[in-house]
Each structure stands twice: as structure tokens, then as C-alpha cells.
Design a protein with these regions (language model features):
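Solvent-exposed loop/turn segments at secondary-structure junctions
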Residues: 76-80, 95-97, 122-126, 152-156
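Second-shell loop/turn segments in exported
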Residues: 41-47, 92-93, 121-125
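Flexible, polar/low-complexity N-terminal or interdomain linker segments that lie immediately upstream
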Residues: 2-7, 11-82, 167-170
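Active-site neighborhoods of enzymes that stabilize oxyanions during catalysis
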Residues: 158-170
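Catalytic cysteine-centered active loop of the rhodanese-like fold, especially the PTP/DSP P-loop
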Residues: 104-151
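Alpha-helical scaffolding within the catalytic cores
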Residues: 75, 98-107
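Structural recognition of the beta-strand scaffold that forms the well-ordered cores
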Residues: 70-74, 88-92, 115-119, 146-149
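Short loop/helix-cap segments at secondary-structure boundaries that form the rim of catalytic
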Residues: 80-86, 159
């Protein structure tokens, strides 16, 4: 007898049902990525515009003066005050109409070929309410060199806890 009891038969049927459902589950709920080359088909930027934290930390250490990127934090002011990438500036929370208007007003004074790096880090990157509106606005304004710093989990986890340089306050 293949299944000696109702309990074993029930367990085997449950395992069979689970194994049949796994392929469907992977389509409906794909696994979270590590953030490497984090580009979804709905993201407005290309893979070439994606910056990983480790790479950007090295770039920060190697560039000074005019070759250094203009770093723009597009998240919430309180988080910026608590800690941010050195040299970053804050010009409004991009998920709000007022914040996006402040960002656009400030950035309109820069040459369109400015080397820009935008980032947030308020929450998991896939759910960030700030990064996509900021990127889209800059792109629509004609900025041609915009890169996105991908912080998969948050600024605290993916930057601070890794020991990358940080600055506090405004």
C-alpha cells in the first residue's frame, strides 16, 4: 500500500497541490531581487543609468571638483537631516506637488548636461514614491545625464550600515 493512512494520503495530496502551484506563484509573486541592475520594465531609466551603492561610494572617493556629480536627495526632509550622501542637496520631496515644483525650480538653473545622481532610500526601492517622479521630471526637462542610486531596502541598510560616507543636517 502506497499510503498507509489517511494522514499520509492527505499530506501527499497537500505536497502535490503545493508543487503544482509553485510555477504559478513564481509568476504572480516574483522573488525580490537583490537590487543588482534594478530595472523593471515600467522604470523610465535604463540599466546604464543605475548606480549600485558600492560603485557610487567608490566614485565619490575618486571624483572631486567639477568632475563630481551633482547629488540630489528626492525623499523626505527629516530623513535627509538625519543623514545623507555627502554633498547631496535637498530641494523638496518629489512625491508631493509642492516638493516636485521646488526641485524643478532649483534644477532649472543647471545646464542640461549636468552629471546628476538622484536617490531617496526612504523605503524599499520598488515602492519608493519619490524616485520615479523625480527622474521623470528631470528627463522631461531635458537633462541628459541622470543616474539613479538604487538602495534596495533603505538608505540606512544599504548605505549607512555598509559604512559608506555620510553627512548629517542640512
Amino acid at each position: 500500500m502506497l499510503f498507509p493512512s489517511k494522514l499520509h494520503r492527505s499530506a501527499a495530496m497537500s505536497l502535490l497541490a503545493i508543487s503544482a502551484a509553485l510555477p504559478l506563484a513564481s509568476v504572480l509573486w516574483p522573488a525580490q531581487s537583490s537590487g543588482a541592475n534594478q530595472v523593471k520594465t515600467t522604470d523610465p531609466w535604463s540599466k546604464a543609468q543605475v548606480l549600485q551603492p558600492a560603485d557610487f561610494a567608490v566614485e565619490l572617493g575618486n571624483t572631486k571638483g567639477e568632475s563630481a556629480p551633482t547629488i540630489v536627495y528626492v525623499g523626505f526632509r527629516t530623513l535627509f537631516e538625519g543623514g545623507h550622501v555627502p554633498g547631496a542637496s535637498y530641494h523638496g520631496t518629489a512625491s508631493t506637488e509642492k516638493g516636485l515644483a521646488e526641485l524643478k525650480k532649483w534644477i532649472a538653473t543647471l545646464p542640461r548636461a549636468t552629471n546628476l545622481v538622484i536617490y531617496c532610500g526612504c523605503c524599499p526601492f520598488d515602492h519608493c514614491p519619490n524616485i520615479r517622479p523625480a527622474y521623470t521630471a528631470l528627463h522631461e526637462m531635458g537633462f541628459t545625464h541622470v543616474r539613479v542610486l538604487v538602495l534596495p531596502t533603505s538608505f540606512a541598510v544599504d548605505w549607512v550600515e555598509k559604512g559608506y560616507p555620510m553627512q548629517r543636517g542640512l
